[in-house]
Amino acid sequence: AYKTVLKTPSGEFTLDVPEGTTILDAAEEAGYDLPFSCRAGACSSCLGKVVSGSVDQSEGSFLDDGQMEEGFVLTCIAIPESDLVIETHKEEELF
């Protein structure tokens, strides 16, 4: 599992994300309420931004390459590849 720190508007939370599990699924299992809509990487409701670490979001993404290079991730499809620090609730920053 990878140690993942979620920086949310209501505080900072740390959870362990099992290998192969998305950030959104792991957060929900731990009882954290993150925003989401489609759960399929096809919208930006669950958008977060990676502060440190890396994720795999190759399952298909609403984001373009430039947005991904800036660190934006869709938590519903993003699977940690290392320990992570991620800011959640970032949808309004995209537009």
Curated annotation (Swiss-Prot):
List the InterPro entries.
2Fe-2S_ferredoxin-like_sf, 2Fe-2S_ferredoxin-type, 2Fe2S_fd_BS, Beta-grasp_dom_sf, Fd_pln
Query: Do the record's keywords include Plastid?
Result: yes
An annotated GO BP: electron transport chain
Q: Which organism is it from?
A: Equisetum telmateia
Q: Which protein is depicted?
A: Ferredoxin-1
What's this chain's function? Ferredoxins are iron-sulfur proteins that transfer electrons in a wide variety of metabolic reactions.
Which cofactors, if any, are listed as required?
A: [2Fe-2S] cluster
Similarity comment: family membership: Belongs to the 2Fe2S plant-type ferredoxin family.
Its domain of life?
Eukaryota
Residue sites binding [2Fe-2S] cluster per the record:
C38, C43, C46, C76
Free-text remark on how the cofactor is bound: Binds 1 [2Fe-2S] cluster.
Per UniProt, the keywords (alphabetical) are: 2Fe-2S, Chloroplast, Electron transport, Iron, Iron-sulfur, Metal-binding, Plastid, Transport
Entry's Gene Ontology cellular component terms: chloroplast
- Database matches in Pfam families: Fer2
**A Gene Ontology MF term for this entry?**
metal ion binding
Localization of this protein: Plastid, Chloroplast
Residue ranges annotated for the 2Fe-2S ferredoxin-type domain, each copy included: 2-92
